[in-house]
């Protein structure tokens, strides 16, 4: 069983949600886990239970239901008290404003080609109507990271694909475009230590 070092951060994306299945852009809208998403969360929990041990651990979670459900399933599997989970607003998904709920980014590109272009080419200037800008999004994540690295206890962060990309990108000092191009998968746990990154592909996945 692996022993986590004190500077370790583990990034987990929530399981599949109803809107994931429907192909809708979620942003900060709530959408519960599907049965498949619950099974995904259980698979992640099993991996942590079987392969990692922690003398101490802190779990931080996005306030959205899909992340909280995932966090609770994971916590139960490793005997981590649910009341000790920290709900962290700065781990919330990107506030996409009026485009949240749209059926896919292709539809957004039809409605606003320039907005869609910025998202991929210069995401820090991406600013959907009624939402937050890419630079604001990066700033809140950077602020959170600056806080948690002061405490060397291992940490498990359960949030969203775009949040995980920016966390990884900030630590590697990547540009906004490089961050958005990072791979991100629900069957992968990202283990960060200092400025190194390890991708842990789950051996058993629903």
Feature-to-residue mapping (PLM):
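Extreme N-terminal starter segment of soluble prokaryotic enzymes
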Residues: 3-10
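Active-site-proximal alpha-helix that buttresses catalytic centers in soluble enzyme cores
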Residues: 7, 16-80
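Generic beta-sheet signal
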Residues: 9, 57, 151-162
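Short active-site segment of divalent metal-dependent hydrolases/proteases
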Residues: 17, 163-164
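Phosphate-handling substructures
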Residues: 32, 77-140, 181
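Conserved histidine-centered catalytic loops in small-molecule metabolism enzymes
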Residues: 55-79, 83-90, 114-117, 193-206
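Short beta-strand scaffold positions
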Residues: 61-62, 139, 157-159
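Domain-level recognition of soluble alpha/beta enzyme cores
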Residues: 174-200
């Amino acid at each position: 069983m692996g022993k986590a070092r004190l500077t370790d951060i583990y990034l987990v994306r929530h399981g599949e949600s109803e809107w994931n299945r429907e192909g809708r852009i979620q942003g900060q809208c709530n959408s519960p886990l599907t049965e498949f998403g619950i099974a995904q969360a259980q698979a992640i929990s099993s991996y942590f239970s079987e392969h990692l041990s922690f003398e101490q651990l802190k779990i931080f979670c996005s306030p959205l239901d899909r992340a909280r459900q995932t966090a609770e399933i994971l916590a139960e599997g490793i005997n981590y008290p649910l009341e000790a989970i920290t709900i962290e607003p700065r781990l919330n998904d990107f506030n996409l404003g009026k485009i949240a709920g749209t059926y896919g980014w292709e539809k957004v590109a039809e409605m606003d080609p320039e907005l869609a272009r910025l998202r991929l080419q210069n995401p820090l200037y991406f600013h959907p109507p009624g939402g937050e800008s890419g630079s604001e999004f990066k700033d809140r994540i950077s602020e959170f990271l600056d806080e948690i690295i002061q405490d060397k206890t291992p940490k498990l962060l359960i949030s969203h694909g775009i949040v995980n990309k920016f966390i990884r990108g900030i630590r590697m000092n990547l540009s906004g475009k490089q961050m958005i191009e990072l791979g991100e998968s629900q069957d992968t746990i990202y283990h960060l230590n200092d400025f190194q990154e390890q991708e842990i592909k789950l051996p058993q996945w629903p």
